[in-house]
């Protein structure tokens, strides 16, 4: 029984990672068979873990929020840790493109996820900003919500324009934080 639970957890982790990669490559409408193939499992396993596409999207969203919130930034200076975290945040934003298509923005799930996102990521960003400001590496007047909103807005253009380089624009924004 314990082996089965370990296998189920491993399959779920593989599915979440595979779905996140598929969503980046093809959006949240990526075929379930492609996600299953990336994870090395059968299509039935996908549906056992996530009965609907919305369930899968919500799980990937939460998984990505947790990965961003719990990122290991040890050994990095304050500014380098902030810059690395923002890179991870951009990865998360790219993954979540199309969430509104899978979940209606007026649905309770959408509101709960947005609150979850803010509750988990704002404090992390705030701590990183405070550390970088205390180290004298960035200006001290930047608020976490402002920065996250700015990064998010810079990432929006990438969804519809393959020539749009959100990472470059975000890198310019982050460089502009320097004191």
Task: Please report, for each region that a protein language model flagged, where it lies by residue.
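Basic, helix-initiating cap at the start of DNA-binding domains
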Residues: 1-29, 33-38, 55
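Short amphipathic alpha-helical segment with a characteristic S/N-K-E followed by hydrophobic residues
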Residues: 52-57, 68
